[in-house]
Structures are given as C-alpha cells and as structure tokens.
C-alpha cells in the first residue's frame, strides 16, 4: 500500500536527526492507528517501504548512492517486504571489492545514523565471493539470501548474486531441503514438540510463522516459486489449502503485530504479561481471562492447522526432492491400507466413506511399530473427510467398536494416540475434546493447554508399560501389569480435565461426561462408575499428599475411607503420578514422588488391615518407637540414652516423623555435648527426594522467621516444614528443602546452609539479607492470598491457614507478622504445590491462649496487607 503523503514529505525534507525522528514518530503513529482499519499485510509491507525510502535517503545523505560498486540489498523478512512494527531490519551491502577507508567511514556513519534512530539492524558488508563462502557454511545465511531484494545500487552485481543463489551447487536442492527439515526438527524440539504451551512463540513454535516460511523457502529453492500460490500449479497445493494457509498466515501476522504493539518492542513470545493487551488490540474484548481465552484458542487452532499442512507439504516435497537410493518397502496391511517405508497409506480416498476405517488406520499404526508417519496423500484425505463430517464419530456404532479396540490395544495409546491427537481425530470423535482444544489454564501449575496436558498424561501412562517406566516408576509399572482393565485408566485420563473452561467444578462435570461415555460405549455399570470416580477424585491423592500429614493415622484413615478399595487406590495412584508429571516440566520431583509413594503404601496397609480395624495413634507410636529404637540399639546406643531423649517429646512428635527420621534426630541429640545449646543437622539420606534440615533450639518467638530467612537467602526452596515443641520448652524444626530445579541440595551447599543456620541461632541480632527475584510468571496471575483463621481442637490454640503465590521471602513475611503480634508458633506445616504455597500454623497469643476475635481481625488485616504488597 502507498505511504501517506505526509510521511513521504517529512522524509524528503528531513535534514537533522530530530527531523528523521519526527518522521519516524509520525509514521509509527499512523501505522498503529491503521491496524484496526486495514489488512495487516498492507501494514507490514508499508513498514518495509518506509524503511526502503529511509535507507535510500540516508544512502544519498552519506554519499553512498554514487558508489558504482555498491548495492544495498534487503534480506530475510525485510527482503520479503514483511516488517512488523519492531522487527529487525537485515540488509547486505554488496561490494565488488573490499571498500577503501573513505567508503568504510561513510558506511559506518550510515549505520550509526540507523542506530541513532533506534532501529534494530543486522547488516554485513560482503563481496560476492565472501557471500557465497558464508552461504556455503551457513544455511541460515543461504536462506536469507534466497529472499534478497535490491533496494538501491548496482543491479548487475545483485543479479550475479541471485543467479549464484539459485544455481550454485553449494546447497543443492535436496541438501537445502534436508538442512531446513533438520533445522525445523531442532526448533520444534526446543519447544518440547508442541505449540500448545501457554506462552507460545508465534514465530518459532510448531505451527508458527517459521513453519510457513520453511514451506516457502523450499519452494523457492526447488521450484523457483515466489509465492505459495505457485505451488498449486506444481500440484502440491489445492486451492482450498492455499486459501487456508493464506488465512493462517494473515492471522499469525495479526497476532504478531498486536504483540509488538502490546510489548512496545520486537517480541515473538506471547507472554502472559502481553496477552490481555494483545487480545484487546485484536478486538477480543477487555474482559480479562475470557478475552485471552478466545484469542489463544484461535491461535492454537491456527498453529495446529499450519503444523499439519507443513507436515503434509514437506512429506510431498521429500518425495520429489530427496533422491531415492532404494525403493521403500511396500507392505499390504489389508485391502484398504498399505505400508510404504515408515508411512501408512490409504489405497483409495473412498475407503473413508466407512467412517470406522479412520480408526482402522490408527489400529494399523498400533499393530506395526515400523509405522511412524502418515503418507501425505492420506493426511490430505483425512483433512477432507474431517471437514465433511456431519455429527460426531462416536455416534456411529462401528466407530465406537473401532475406538474401543484401539484403547484396549497394547500399543493403541502410544504413537497411534499421539497421531490421532495431532490430526484432529479425537476432536472428531469426542465433542467435549473440541471444547478443550487450545483451552488456556490460568493457574500457577500448568504449562500447556488442557488438550496438550491430557495428551501428555496419556503418554505418561503408556510409559508405565515401557522399560523406562519400570526403572523410573516401579510401583506404577508393577500395578499396570496386574491391572485387569488398563483402558479404564486411559479413559479416566482422557476425561479428567475435559470439563475445564465450562465453569463449575470440572471434576464433577467431567465425571458426568465419563458416565455418559461409558453408557454409550456399553461399559458395565461398575466400569463406568470407576471411570467417573477417578475423574471426580483425580485431585484427591495429590491434595492429600501435599497438604496433609500423611504420617497421621487419622489422615490415612480418612483417605482410605474415600478410596474404599485397593483397586481404586491402584488406579488413582497411577493417574495422579501421570497427571502431575504432565502438568509442567518442573512440578514433578523426587520429593513429590516420595510423598505419593508413602501415601500409597500407608493407604494400602490401612486397606489391608480393614477400615473397621484401623491402626490407632497409640499403635503407630508404639511401632515407630520399636523400629527406631532397634535401629539405634544396632548402632550401639544405650536404651537409657534413647529413653531420656524421647521422654522430652510429646506424642505428636512420634506421629509427625518416620522411624528413620526419629532415629536420625535421636543420634544427633544423644551425641550432643550440651543439650541446652541450639544445633543443626542436614542430610540427604533421612528422606529420599529432599534435603532434610533438623534444628533443635530453646524456644524463641522470632526464631522461625530467622530460619526461613536464612534458607531463602541461600536460594533454597522450602517444600515442607514442621514445627513442634518439646515438653520442656524447646522447639524442633524440620525442613525439607530443594534446589530451584527440584533436586536435593548438593553436599557442599548443604553444609553452607547448615553453617548459616547455626550463625542465625547463635547471633540472633545479625541481619539476614537476600535478594528478591520475583519470577515473571508470578506477575502474570492476579491471585490474591487466601487467609483463614479458625479455632483449633485445643482450646488454647488457633489455626491460621494461608494460600499464596510462593514468592521469595514469603515465609519470612508471614513470620514477621506473627512476630509483630507476639504470636507463639506451636506447630506449622509448610507445603509448596507448583508455585503456590499452602501454609498451616498452630499459634497462640502472648499469653499462650487462643486468639481473640479482635486479635484475629488485626492479624488477618496485617497478613493481607503484607502479602498483597508482595504480590503486586
């Protein structure tokens, strides 16, 4: 489109730096204002034209326009004439020979002026020989030259370069193709193979702009096609596919343009911070999450279409471009399908007139591990059939039978399920799946859309049957080998989050959907109830393990009562492990593995005893004491030494800790020279999966605040904390701490933390400093702390429950409020679930009494003020 006359005049008249800046400012205001009025393609072309005119003007200003041996060439996106508001400007200065000092100085002044105008530029000065040599070594540079465009100067040299680019054998067509495919593969792998993470990169993610550009680059190199449309005449694209790709390209451009406006800079990642403003700019509204959901759902669906078309076209290109040293093996699978190499092909599009044959294709994939891909013509046929479907595939009895065969197949939920997900067959079968496709999740846990999270969960369950699963998840692997109906576990996984985004309790709504599915597919009443129960309770085990004291027999009894049977416990445990691992790449760690395993084993034991014969607290204490004492006696400790230490502990100590921990604590205390003095021990052996820190000290109100501050200052994360008091006025702290990456603390670091804690105990007045380093992700969720004060079973105690974003220093802030209000902490339970802290404190006031209503109100207000200030 033509630039406004005023922009042209301002640029023509510009003399001083301030004039150029005024011209640029006017242009960008015009550009941003036009976004809601014009097709985005016009605007990105307009910016390229504006930069063309600016460079040509400055070429004249710095007396470069009269140099006969110089050509100014746009490359990359700028060469295509596509510049988003803040995109980099890449150009090549092509010279016939190395420029002399005078010309080099002029070039330097030219480039400096562009920097002074705050333009992000990428430039190089090359002879044709140098450009060809760099092209030989660097496929990225070769690709950028493929899109080169002469802006000004020596057109003869430019044409020589263009001819070399196309005809030179340096990057033969097949070599270029293989290099671009490998480049795309590595790019996708960096994104974990999915476009559906919640902060997608519009350019680099699978299905992003790069995938579209890869198609164009290969077409230019091999077919000398300048546009996608030319692929129609070459027989690679249908008119409908060209229209679809064009529509996808325009949509991605729109979102990227809006992202630049929202960020105020060049940005390709659609970060949470930018999503609300980008959604508003794009016309999705300004109603927060709803607007963002609509925008992101459209984006994810566009990226899915691009990825599928990219996959299909590159497969077609490979057939034409890559030399065949030998014919691929062709194996007939049945009368409708054949295997060609590692691809499955439908023999005739008419096969899919019988809808159940769509699932037969995936059943063959499950049957044949050699098949890793779908033949490109078959992808095209699937796409066409998918578009013409009337109703859901589950409405056809033959499809239901085929679907059930697939989920019961030993390999059906592996690659076959992944390809079904990738090619839209789950959405074609289950209407509820269409609703979660591209569905955002606004919480502090999930890194992926609902459908992608569910896909990963299913992959995790499938892994239990694999050799890697046996070593990494031995209990789950052992369970599934004796599981009578693993398909029920898979179905619970498919439905566990299927009601997200509808409002209401997604677990209960999903259970209703699961029951309806079971009825439609003729499952027995018992099987349908099990699937629905798993969906309804899929968070139960995770919540219990991470928020409650799993060493408390009462907690185990309550959990076992809800689980009811060992069979349901087995299914729930396998589902929970797979669910947490599929949530994001950082949530699962050895500590959570240990918690869930212990809860599973405790509950299994309780169920085997019988719910009518639960182990009571006295039995548990007696058993733990016996086992811990036996350990200590075997190590050479005397019984009277052990009894003397234990006589100081209340009963809750023996329920709170395992026999291994009790033994570890006791060894330390028996060996202590002076039990009137505080002490610290640290170990990675006391509990698998985390570093244990045990602190023994005379009771002091501010002590908790100091200890958690020290741990925070050492950049360790507190996963779990317990505070217990002895009968004689001492306090016991037990922390489980991890590195930021979820690993236990290394030995050297652990000793450093131990020394710092000892210093805090012996030098209580020394200030503790630590740097606040608030994660970007915390800023992206407007989640206010939840603070609840309630009575405690003991009349002289109160319970404080706090849920908040786990910001650095959170526990310190809480402890500071407690200290300011002279509260005594008698017990605490600190848990971290994802990036949310859930903390429980048993406290009393300065008179060791329960908090009065007035005290509760003051503490509630103080906590809210302190924590809101930290999360804003």
UniProtKB/Swiss-Prot annotation:
Cofactor dependence: Mg(2+)
Activity regulation, free text: Uridylyltransferase (UTase) activity is inhibited by glutamine, while glutamine activates uridylyl-removing (UR) activity.
GO biological process, one term: regulation of nitrogen utilization
Region (Uridylyltransferase): 1-332
Keyword Transferase among record annotations: yes
Pfam family for this entry, one: HD
Catalytic activity from the UniProt record: [protein-PII]-L-tyrosine + UTP = [protein-PII]-uridylyl-L-tyrosine + diphosphate; [protein-PII]-uridylyl-L-tyrosine + H2O = [protein-PII]-L-tyrosine + UMP + H(+)
Its EC number(s): 2.7.7.59, 3.1.4.-
GO molecular function, one term: [protein-PII] uridylyltransferase activity
Region (Uridylyl-removing): 333-691
Keyword Transferase: yes
Keywords of this entry: Hydrolase, Magnesium, Multifunctional enzyme, Nucleotidyltransferase, Repeat, Transferase
Gene3D superfamilies: Beta Polymerase, domain 2, cca-adding enzyme, domain 2, Nucleotidyltransferases domain 2
Domain HD, residue spans: 450-572
Coiled coil feature spans: none
SUPFAM superfamilies: ACT-like, HD-domain/PDEase-like, Nucleotidyltransferase, Nucleotidyltransferase substrate binding subunit/domain
UniProt signal peptide: none
Domain topic, free-text comment: Has four distinct domains: an N-terminal nucleotidyltransferase (NT) domain responsible for UTase activity, a central HD domain that encodes UR activity, and two C-terminal ACT domains that seem to have a role in glutamine sensing.
Task of the protein: Modifies, by uridylylation and deuridylylation, the PII regulatory proteins (GlnB and homologs), in response to the nitrogen status of the cell that GlnD senses through the glutamine level. Under low glutamine levels, catalyzes the conversion of the PII proteins and UTP to PII-UMP and PPi, while under higher glutamine levels, GlnD hydrolyzes PII-UMP to PII and UMP (deuridylylation). Thus, controls uridylylation state and activity of the PII proteins, and plays an important role in the regulation of nitrogen assimilation and metabolism.
PANTHER family tied to this protein: BIFUNCTIONAL URIDYLYLTRANSFERASE/URIDYLYL-REMOVING ENZYME (PTHR47320), BIFUNCTIONAL URIDYLYLTRANSFERASE_URIDYLYL-REMOVING ENZYME (PTHR47320:SF1)
Protein name as it appears in the record: Bifunctional uridylyltransferase/uridylyl-removing enzyme
